[in-house]
């Protein structure tokens, strides 16, 4: 009964109801879309950087005069429950055969048995070199092309994606090949990468590394990539909630619109309310009737707004961020729907209460 009466009353002033409905749709779409956008950003970061969360990078502390690590430092770290990967690094010009030009690049040297732990999906031999996507695109080279370093030719054996471990414009050689170019007796490493199989041991390994290498003085800087990811995700989460809060302002405006519609309805339906009260309708019945009207507006507007947010969220995440919708999209849609319905009901409380307080005799006398 309540539902049918509420539906009839909303149809009576259809244009006014549609305008109130639009406010809810826009508000819910804004809240959900901004939440989905934040979720998409986190998803994109995890897709691009999640593969490096198991790594710790150890750099020399240049401020204290340390520029490299030696064999003794490496051996000290072998006791840790992780894979210790010493890395050579320098910058130099390489000659691109067939292009008749040189290119400047960051060159890394890693033991060929350690490369498999770096999730680069390349296999490098002592006669080959791997290049990152940036170097490949800028210099128009691909697998099979030849690079020349120190007048020695190396075949490009693979292309890997740049990460925090190996930034843009980089090449990877085996440690043996690197020493061939930059000193056979060169065992001074520019950095150390620690691969921790169990991500839950990251903090423990980081602390143990600090105790081993920084026991006497600050010899190195230790960076946990997992902690960087957590910090980035934390910032994005806070920004997402802030943006959702801004979106909630439009929902507040929509709530005011619904309250206004309901108050006007009370004035217009004074006689009708008086008739209902005179034939036995209680104050509770009047309140429930108005809340049903608000509920219908809230449910319809929230559902439309939520699905619009899913549509626009997909377009933004897929085409702009180049990633996929996360499972959080449903969560933000539900949050938007709940807020939309609650806003509608809360906005109708005062008009419903005012309608229930109308004196039936005075209402009929006005007619």
From Swiss-Prot:
One of its GO terms (cellular component) is plasma membrane. It is a multi-pass membrane protein. One of its GO terms (molecular function) is transmembrane transporter activity. The chain crosses the membrane at residues 18-38, 239-259, 296-316, 329-349. It is found in: Cell membrane. The keyword Cell membrane applies. InterPro entries: ABC3_permease_C, MacB_PCD, Macrolide_Exporter_MacB. Belongs to the ABC-4 integral membrane protein family. This is Uncharacterized ABC transporter permease MJ0797.
């Amino acid at each position: 009964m309540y539902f049918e009466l509420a539906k009839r009353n909303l149809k009576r002033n259809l244009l006014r109801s549609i305008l109130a409905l639009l406010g809810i749709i826009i508000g819910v779409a804004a809240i959900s879309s901004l939440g989905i956008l934040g979720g998409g950003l986190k998803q994109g970061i995890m897709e691009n950087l999640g593969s490096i969360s198991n790594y710790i990078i150890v750099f020399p502390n240049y401020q204290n005069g340390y520029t490299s690590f030696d064999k003794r430092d490496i051996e000290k770290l072998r006791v840790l429950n992780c894979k210790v990967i010493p890395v050579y690094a320098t910058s130099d010009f390489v000659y691109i055969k067939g292009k008749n030009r040189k290119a400047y690049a960051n060159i890394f040297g890693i033991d060929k048995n350690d490369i498999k732990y770096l999730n680069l999906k390349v296999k490098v031999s002592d006669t080959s070199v791997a290049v990152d996507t940036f170097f490949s695109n800028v210099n128009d080279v691909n697998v099979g092309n030849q690079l020349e370093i120190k007048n020695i030719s190396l075949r490009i054996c693979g292309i890997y994606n740049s990460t925090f471990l190996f930034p843009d414009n980089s090449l990877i050689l085996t440690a043996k090949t690197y020493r061939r170019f930059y000193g056979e007796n060169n065992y001074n490493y520019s950095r150390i990468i620690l691969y921790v199989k169990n991500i839950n041991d990251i903090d423990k390994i980081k602390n143990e590394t600090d105790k081993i290498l920084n026991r006497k003085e600050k010899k190195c800087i230790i960076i946990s990539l997992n902690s960087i990811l957590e910090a980035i995700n934390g910032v994005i989460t806070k920004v997402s909630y802030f943006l959702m809060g801004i979106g909630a302002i439009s929902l507040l405006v929509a709530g005011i619109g619904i309250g206004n519609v309901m108050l006007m309805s009370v004035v217009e339906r004074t006689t009708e309310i008086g008739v209902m009260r005179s034939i036995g309708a209680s104050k509770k019945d009047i309140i429930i009737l108005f809340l049903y009207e608000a509920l219908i507006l809230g449910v319809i507007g929230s559902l439309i707004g939520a699905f619009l947010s899913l549509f626009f969220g997909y377009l933004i995440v897929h085409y702009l961020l180049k990633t996929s919708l996360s499972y959080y999209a449903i969560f933000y849609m539900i949050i938007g729907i709940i807020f939309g319905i609650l806003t509608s009901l809360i906005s109708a409380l005062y008009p419903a209460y005012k309608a229930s307080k109308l004196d039936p005799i005075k209402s009929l006398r006005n007619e």
